[in-house]
Amino acid sequence: MTPCDPVRVARPSDKLARLMALERAVVATRNEHKLRELREILTGVELLPLPADVELPREDAETFAENALDKARAAHAATGLAAIADDSGIVASALGGRPGPRSARYAGPDATDEENLNLLLSELADKDDRSVAYVAALAYVDADGNEKLVEGRCEGTLAEQPRGTGGFGYDPAFVPADTGPDDDRTMAELDPDEKHAISHRGRAARRLAEVLVSKR
């Protein structure tokens, strides 16, 4: 695998804030970690939590993109607001792309992050190829129902043991390629700004900003 493209734009916040100044956006997730990260990346944009009475569709599509679009459409339909939805996960080359869109429930429907990570670690324990990638699909539906979809990707390898206390999901074992060949820190060992500069979710947010700017 090749590393992700170098990061040329540090943050999309100012552009996105100007574009969305007249409308708030609800984030179609119940995952507090995702909501927090999107708020850290898209500073200056008013991102609202999903109302408690809004039901999201099951994430049972075959691709990250389909899941993200389904959630953004549902949140927009229920609230009438612009909506942003993220669907993301990890793909392992040696496992044919698994866990993929099932990343959040890889070890079972109610599995914890630790259980999911431990299962992946056990499946790669005897594999020579430990290359993995984080993939994020970010869907945006504006207040008029117009849709945009972007994806971000970050290549890396899976460490043999978890390290670090930051992040969530598979971060404690994900060693990103973009920090350099002599840096073996996991995503969970990076500070938030370092992580967002190279992460799949950060890249997707920057691409969304560029797409929206180009359409105006």
List each language-model region with its residue ranges.
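Anionic-ligand binding patches
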Residues: P12-V26, H33-R216
